[in-house]
């Protein structure tokens, strides 16, 4: 059942082992993915508005759009898939830009939906470490749906879990796996994000914090592992069905079965008339779409490369990415080039610096794999918006470099490391408009996109979040791509 909560200042909990975190929990209630697929068959299409491209990491054979023209949305609605993604990239925008982009997508989607006769339900995909424009995005989606005649939103369901990456929620407290064990996300480097920082790991208090007190922690409905595992889908559907007036519910999950119980409950509640919006991490999408976890793509499934060497673009500056780069260097066979942030911020040097790096990298690509990366030390502005503007400028420079390199020499593959980096590389450097997310290179992480048309057709595009995988993950992904 829902449980009352009492917001307090967060007390650091520190690390604990995963075994300690999971000890004493109720037995998992097994739900096959096929049961969810049957429950949603013929129902509303799940449309995921992805605030950066890394939300596709848990799914396979799902359409992805990087543009939201009505024709593109109609194409996605016609595909034989229980869900599709629209890459909004709003995590890289300020609040006003994010709000306007969400409005544009919903208005075009409503038109496309009516033209195709296919109804939909919306999920706003945010970061599993709780960064992004919440509650702004779900507020805008609710307003636009109401304006389109879809009625008011009964509830907003927050499900940040990302199972493969070790982002787990237990007793409404959200944890992340680290090299030292499980850590509450509010004590991680991601909680200190210059743009989307926060203090609380406990989701009801996090909701109160992010809504600036508009929603109190005591008013947040908590759906716990006891609800999911002991009482099951019908009970949880009742909790969801009781939501009114856009009330927020937060949901525990430590495994895919928990999310499939939730998916069944959501389908039941929706079939009974509940109008729900979802703010979710990557794992909920797979469960709600009725997909089971799939093995990573094999070298044979990737097919023969069209060129001898690949390009790796690295924009993420988090510590994990830096360690992954170190391991990739140890593997050898790389030429590495840096875009210096200080030179990029100098209007007199910027263009020449990008041109110099691009020319050298394109030449090296004929001989070996190439890494083009930004300065590893993050440069911040005076406030959150200024920091975001610097990030956008650096990302734009990386995009210019990738565009120039690939125009000169076709790579065997392109890996984009970091959320903003992977979005801008897809849309601006490679001009990907429609693609299929075919699967992952590593278990549950690192999505491979197959562009449908355009200059990137035939080039595997790998979306690699800055904050996922072990220290060897980038080297492992490159090793697989080299083995084709």
What are these regions (language model features)?
Residues 173-357:
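Conserved, well-structured core segments that form the ligand-binding/active-site neighborhood
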Residues 57-87, 356-362, 437-455:
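N-terminal short beta-loop-beta anion/metal-coordinating cradle
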Residues 58-61, 133-137, 167-175, 260-265, ...:
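Short acidic, glycine/serine/threonine-rich loops at helix termini
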Residues 82-90, 448-484:
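A structural-propensity feature for long, helix-poor, extended segments
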Residues 358-419:
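C-terminal structural cap/anchor segments
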Residues 36-50, 80-82, 93-122, 126-259, ...:
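Cap/lid and interdomain-hinge subdomains that line or gate substrate/regulatory clefts
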Residues 9-79, 164:
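N-terminal basic/disordered segments at the start of proteins
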Residues 280-307, 438-462, 466:
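Short, flexible loop segments at boundaries between secondary-structure elements
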């Amino acid at each position: 059942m829902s449980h009352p909560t009492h917001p307090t200042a967060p007390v650091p909990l520190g690390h604990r082992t995963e075994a300690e975190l999971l000890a004493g929990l109720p037995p998992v209630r097994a739900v096959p993915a096929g049961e969810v697929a049957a429950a949603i068959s013929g129902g509303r299409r799940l449309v995921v508005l992805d605030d950066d491209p890394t939300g596709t990491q848990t799914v396979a054979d799902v359409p992805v759009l990087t543009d939201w023209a009505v024709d593109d949305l109609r194409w996605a609605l016609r595909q034989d898939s229980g869900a599709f993604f629209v890459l909004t990239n709003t995590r890289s925008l300020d609040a006003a830009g994010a709000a306007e982009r969400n409005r544009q997508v919903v208005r075009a989607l409503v038109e496309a939906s009516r033209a195709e006769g296919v109804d939909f339900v919306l999920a706003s995909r945010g970061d599993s470490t709780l960064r992004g424009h919440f509650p702004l995005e779900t507020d805008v989606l609710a307003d636009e749906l109401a304006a389109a005649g879809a009625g008011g939103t009964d509830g907003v369901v927050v499900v940040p879990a990302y199972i493969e990456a070790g982002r787990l929620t237990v007793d409404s407290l959200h944890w992340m796996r680290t090299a030292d064990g499980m850590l509450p996300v509010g004590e991680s480097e991601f909680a200190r994000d210059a743009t989307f920082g926060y203090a609380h790991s406990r989701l009801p208090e996090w909701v109160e914090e992010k809504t600036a007190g508009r929603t109190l922690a005591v008013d947040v409905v908590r759906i716990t592992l006891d609800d999911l595992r002991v009482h099951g889908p019908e009970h949880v559907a009742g909790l969801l069905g009781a939501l009114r007036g856009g009330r927020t519910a937060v949901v525990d999950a430590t495994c895919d079965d928990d999310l499939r119980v939730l998916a069944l409950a959501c389908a039941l509640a929706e079939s009974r008339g509940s109008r729900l919006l979802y703010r979710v991490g990557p794992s909920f999408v797979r469960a709600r779409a009725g997909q089971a976890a799939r093995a990573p793509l094999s070298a044979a499934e990737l097919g023969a490369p069209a060129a001898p060497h690949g390009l790796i673009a690295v924009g993420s500056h988090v510590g994990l990415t830096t360690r992954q780069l170190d391991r990739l260097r140890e593997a050898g066979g790389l030429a590495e080039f840096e875009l210096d942030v200080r030179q990029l911020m100098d209007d007199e040097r910027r263009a020449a610096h990008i041109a110099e790096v691009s020319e050298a990298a394109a030449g090296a690509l004929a001989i070996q794999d190439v890494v083009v990366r930004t300065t590893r030390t993050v440069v911040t502005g005076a406030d959150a918006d200024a920091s975001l503007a610097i990030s956008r400028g650096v990302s734009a420079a990386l995009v210019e470099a990738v565009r120039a390199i690939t125009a000169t020499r076709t790579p065997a593959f392109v890996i984009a490391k970091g959320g903003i980096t992977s979005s801008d590389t897809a849309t601006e450097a490679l001009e990907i408009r429609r693609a299929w997310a075919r699967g992952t290179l590593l278990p549950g992480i690192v999505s491979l996109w197959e562009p449908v048309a355009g200059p990137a057709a035939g080039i595997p595009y790998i979306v690699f979040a800055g904050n996922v995988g072990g220290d060897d993950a980038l080297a492992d992904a490159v090793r697989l791509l080299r083995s084709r």
